[in-house]
Regions:
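A structural-propensity feature for long, helix-poor, extended segments
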Residues: 125-164, 291-324, 379-380, 388, ...
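Catalytic alpha/beta core of large soluble enzyme barrels
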Residues: 270-272, 316-321, 403-407, 416-423, ...
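Internal maturation/activation junctions in enzymes
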Residues: 216-218, 308-331, 335, 339, ...
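Terminal amphipathic helices with adjacent charged low-complexity linkers/tails
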Residues: 10, 14, 180, 196-197, ...
């Protein structure tokens, strides 16, 4: 493998993130953190643990691979905290005992550091009679407020606030109350909301058909599908939520569709999970693989990406074995399927470093080549791990290879899986990578475009107050450190891109990802509602698993604010 280019010195925000989120005890510098994490994860190896610790340290120390935040914060600390970023909780039981048992399990999981996802569809609608008591039910949204208050209480004193995803089926009788649940500012502040949209709803919208709202097999009332669809999109337009999950497509594309049905996902949407499923995440930092940036000779080392992907899969597989699990059911579920989510970050910056525009055919071709390389390397590594350590317990070769995603794998990989098995049911997911991208020098997050050359970022302190920190984008800073002026060739920001350009990149990436993708499509504040609504329909037509569109200013004060041209800042004091 070719030597990697030297890393530019970390941005000021990087040290701030390390101190607030990932530093443990008396660690003097980030290399102490890397060594702690590498040693802890290598402990899963049956032999040669010191050797694997060194290999994992090399993976981390030059920022090639950035593990999920819970891994960085908790591995090797002896804290009773999980290394897994998020979980989907068990299926809710529509009884007072069942709901408060689920609330308790959610509290235990949040206390251990995990975000959670919940499907509230099993809860009877408001106004229905309870079976045993005859009391009138208050509906799922009322119970969501209970979860929200619990989450606020459990995580109020932490730099990392509790995160929850709440979902509801599009045919639940309380779907309209769910859609409007965050219209009031500050309501359900700990939740992201998404509607589980079925193929039947899309067909009914197309046919301008009636849409029955159903609970326990009984139709409660009927409305026009088109009116419901527009109400979902109008709420998203006005408030930024709910997002949409195309749940039938998620289940069709699930590698374990022969053994489970998915109803929910993690809070950021990149990993649909079964009840008690867990997110085990890490991202390859693409900026570390671009040599001679901003020159005609700029190139990407795809062989090094493949090698990093192979080692990253082993790292994440080990995490499943060394992690603490808040609940035994979570440990059981994680080890049945051994899902991991290897992703990327820094895509937009890697494009800029090569002079490629995010919205160009060449930019999408680069993303496809990167993710195709990663997919093949990750599946190869998982087959090799199966030879060493065994396949995941739910593996059935015929059923696994009959799934849509595995059908699209190269034939040599399908043959290898049939002959040798595979260690992990899922291998790829693209997370938002907010904090770890800041740790890596403020590289562009996940597959998102660069938000702006320089931004002012609101950062929450433990006190609950917010500071404002100025930050340069990684590629922009690298360009200026090399003597460049203005903006580098190929530099384009999220706000300058059309929604179609965002969607095209997400669709390109989704074809290579067996889990899902966390992606926000940015829209101008003055975008007409009709154009906004078309984005969601295009997302459906392109085969995406989910869609979130954020219209600037629709959630009040934005976390990121661009600094206008002429006020760029490249100093370390900004």
């Amino acid at each position: 493998v070719k030597p990697l280019p030297p890393a530019t010195p970390p941005a000021p925000i990087s040290e701030d993130i390390w101190i607030r989120k990932y530093r443990f005890g008396s660690e003097a510098g980030i290399d102490d953190t890397w060594r702690r994490v590498a040693k802890a994860v290598a402990a899963a190896e049956p032999q040669d643990q010191a050797l694997w610790a060194e290999r994992f340290h090399g993976l981390l120390a030059d920022y090639r691979f950035l593990p999920g935040g819970r891994i960085l914060a908790n591995a090797g600390t002896a804290r009773n905290a999980t290394l897994l970023n998020c979980f989907v909780m068990g299926a809710l039981d529509d009884s007072i005992e069942g709901l408060f048992h689920a609330l308790r399990e959610s509290a235990i999981t949040l206390q251990a550091g995990g975000g959670i996802g919940l499907d509230f569809s099993p809860i009877r609608p408001a106004g229905a009679a309870a079976v045993r008591t005859g009391n009138i039910a208050s509906g799922p949204v009322s119970f969501m407020h209970l979860w929200d208050a619990m989450c606020e209480t459990m995580t109020a004193d932490r730099a990392r606030r509790g995160a929850m995803m709440g979902v509801l089926r599009c045919d639940h009788p309380d779907i309209e109350a769910f859609i409007d649940a965050k219209v009031e500012p500050g309501a359900l502040a700990r939740f992201n909301l998404s509607v589980l949209v079925t193929d039947d709803l899309i067909r009914a919208v197309d046919g301008d058909d009636d849409w029955p709202l159903v609970f326990a097999g009984k139709t409660v009332r009927i409305l026009k599908a088109r009116i419901l669809w527009e109400r979902i999109l109008r709420a998203a337009y006005e408030t930024g939520e709910p997002g949409i999950l195309f749940i039938d497509r998620i289940n069709r594309e699930n590698n374990l569709g022969y053994a489970e049905t998915l109803h929910a996902c993690n809070p950021c949407g990149e990993v649909p999970l079964p009840p008690y499923g867990a997110c085990d995440l890490g991202s390859i930092n693409l900026t570390r693989f671009i040599s001679q940036p901003f020159t005609p000779e700029a190139a990407c080392d795809f062989d090094a990406i493949a090698e990093t992907a192979r080692l990253g899969v082993r790292f994440l597989d080990n995490v499943l074995d060394v992690s603490h699990y808040p609940l035994e059911a979570q440990a059981d579920q994680a080890r049945k399927g051994r899902r991991v989510g290897l992703g990327i970050t820094g895509l937009a910056d890697a494009l800029i470093m090569q002079g490629l525009a995010y919205d160009s055919n060449e930019g999408r071709e680069f993303a496809a080549r990167v993710l195709g390389t990663m997919r093949n390397a990750a599946y190869e590594a998982s087959v090799q791990l199966a030879e060493e350590k065994g396949s995941f317990p739910l593996f059935n070769a015929d059923a696994f290879l009959d799934r849509p995603f595995t059908h699209r794998l190269p034939e040599y990989l399908r043959d290898e899986i049939r002959r040798k098995g595979i260690r992990n049911s899922h291998l790829l997911a693209i997370a938002p990578t907010g904090s770890i991208s800041l740790l890596g020098g403020n590289v562009s997050a996940g597959i998102e475009p660069v938000f702006a050359a320089t931004v002012s970022r609101r950062v929450r302190r433990l006190s609950g107050d917010y500071d404002t920190i100025g930050m340069d984008d990684y590629a922009f800073r690298l360009w200026h450190e090399g003597g460049g002026e203005g903006l580098p060739p190929g530099f384009v920001t999220a706000g300058e891109l059309s929604p179609d350009a965002h969607l095209a990149m997400q669709a390109t990436a989704q074809g290579f990802v067996d889990n899902a993708i966390s992606k926000t499509i940015n829209a101008d504040a003055d975008m007409p509602f009709e154009a906004f609504a078309n984005v969601y329909r295009t997302a459906c037509d392109l085969g995406l698993k989910g869609c979130t569109v954020y219209r600037q200013g629709s959630r009040g004060e934005d976390v990121l604010t661009p600094v206008t041209e002429g006020a760029w800042c490249t100093s370390d004091t900004c």
